Design a protein with these regions (language model features):
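Active-site-adjacent beta-strand/loop module that shapes the phosphate/pyrophosphate-binding cleft
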Residues: 272-295
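Nudix hydrolase/Nudix homology domain
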Residues: 1-175, 230-234, 297-336
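The catalytic Nudix box helix
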Residues: 235-270, 284
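Active-site proximal loops enriched in glycine and acidic residues that flank catalytic Cys/His/Asp
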Residues: 225-226, 238, 267-272, 288, ...
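Short functional micro-motifs and their immediate structural scaffolds
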Residues: 183-186, 204
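N-terminal strand-loop-strand
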Residues: 75-78, 176, 190-236, 240, ...
Length: 336
């Protein structure tokens, strides 16, 4: 019985950051281009996004490449050190990945499916039997971690790309047959789409739009914590966009539902792909309108409170749009 896994591969010779002296992810808001494809770098607060190259054509995994395997919602890493990779943030841990040659030597009949490319880095998914998966685990000395571990992993330049691999793997895994006529779907040769060769039905990757909301009250920011979720650190009000609803309307509704507050002066900040939950996130800042008395929806949140700039934690992981927005407010870098 085969199970679906994903492999990310990259060229070792080019290293993690460089491609012909071009940075895949640079620093302080620099923007680079390569093959008419823009790649945004880390901005001042460390948040990174990328425009992934979706050139849908035949690609082959080959020697000199390295990367992680994904299997049933978990990631195979060759090294997951208990020692922090960043002494300023004890939650960040260094990981590395097995080489393509090692995997190929142990599983020569594995079939790879191309996902996407980031300059010298190609992402593939691969079908492995359970026995092969356990064998790979043994010979590489690796271990499996879940996708949420990636929020505290390093190096950051591949974390969001790996999470995009999770996103696509889940989409492929859930869409084998046409929902209209039940025939098997095939990959399109031109765009990122699965097509039914019988009835012509087209299936695109599922992307769920959601908002992240920074509600301000003078020099205070509304911070929350989720109820019943794995992530236990500070967050902002957040929620999914509903059918027939503008994103600004989503902002008003989610803030009211979760905290009982009314808001005004809604301002767009920026967006971020978030493959952890198959989202595209849109960040907004707004101001409390009227009373600032909070009525917490305990089904969604375990707490919500106003926090002054001086009280906001400084050691936030740098991956998420949420933490960037919290840091931007703490450093008073926006129009608040």
């Amino acid at each position: 019985m085969e199970v679906t896994s994903v492999v990310m591969v990259r060229s070792e010779a080019l290293g993690f950051l460089a491609y012909k002296k071009r940075r895949i992810f640079g620093c302080s808001g620099t923007v680079y281009t390569h093959e008419k494809r823009k790649i945004e770098a880390y901005n001042d607060s460390g948040h990174c996004t990328t425009y992934v190259g979706h050139n849908i054509q035949k690609h082959t995994a080959g020697p000199g490449q390295q990367g992680p395997f994904f299997s049933r919602g978990q990631l195979l890493v060759q090294q997951a050190s208990d020692k922090p990779a960043d002494e300023s943030n004890q939650d960040i841990h260094q990981i590395s990945f097995p080489r393509y040659e090692d995997i190929k030597a142990e599983c020569p009949d594995a079939k790879y499916q191309y996902l996407f490319t980031l300059d010298d880095t190609a992402f593939f998914r691969v079908a492995l039997s359970h026995a092969d998966k356990m064998h790979i685990l043994e010979v590489t000395g690796g271990k499996f971690i879940n996708r949420h571990y990636m929020r505290s992993a390093s190096p950051k330049e591949y974390v969001l790309a790996a999470i995009t691999g999770f996103h696509l793997d889940g989409w492929y895994d859930k869409n084998h047959f046409c929902g209209r006529c039940a025939n098997r779907l095939v990959e399109d040769d031109v765009e990122r789409m699965l097509r039914c060769p019988v009835c012509g039905n087209m299936v695109y990757p599922r992307i769920n739009p959601a908002v992240i909301v920074g509600v301000t009250n003078g020099d205070k920011l509304l911070l929350t914590k989720y109820n019943g979720r794995e992530y236990k650190k500070y967050a902002l009000v957040a929620g999914f966009n509903e059918i027939g609803e503008s994103l600004e309307e989503t902002v008003r509704r989610e803030v009211m539902e979760e905290t009982g507050l009314r808001v005004k002066n809604i301002r767009y900040y920026k967006s971020q792909p978030w493959g952890f939950t198959d989202n595209i996130l849109a960040g907004y800042f707004c101001e409390v309108d009227g009373t600032d008395e909070i009525e917490v929806d305990m089904q969604e949140l375990s707490m919500a409170k106003w926090v002054s700039r001086e009280e906001i934690p400084t050691s936030l992981e740098e991956l998420s749009l949420t933490n960037e927005m919290i840091s931007v407010f703490r450093l008073d870098k926006g129009d608040f």
